[in-house]
Amino acid sequence: MPKMKTHRGAAKRVKRTGSGKLKRSRAFTSHLFANKSTKQKRKLRKASLVSKSDMKRVKQLLAYKK
């Protein structure tokens, strides 16, 4: 079986924290801000963790990323 490769798109979007969790940025932050409340925009600035249900799949995409 061939070697697994790191998914480059996922590698650019996700960082691993010190404890091994995966940190990601939030969606809905590129445009159309006039329709979003100030509170919503403020909450979108904060990074978030990859959910437990997606963790296995995302870790597989980032097989060799430190």
Curated annotation (Swiss-Prot):
GO terms for molecular function: structural constituent of ribosome. GO terms for biological process: translation. Residues 1-26 have a biased composition (Basic residues). Keywords: Ribonucleoprotein, Ribosomal protein. One of its GO terms (cellular component) is cytosolic large ribosomal subunit. Belongs to the bacterial ribosomal protein bL35 family. This is Large ribosomal subunit protein bL35.
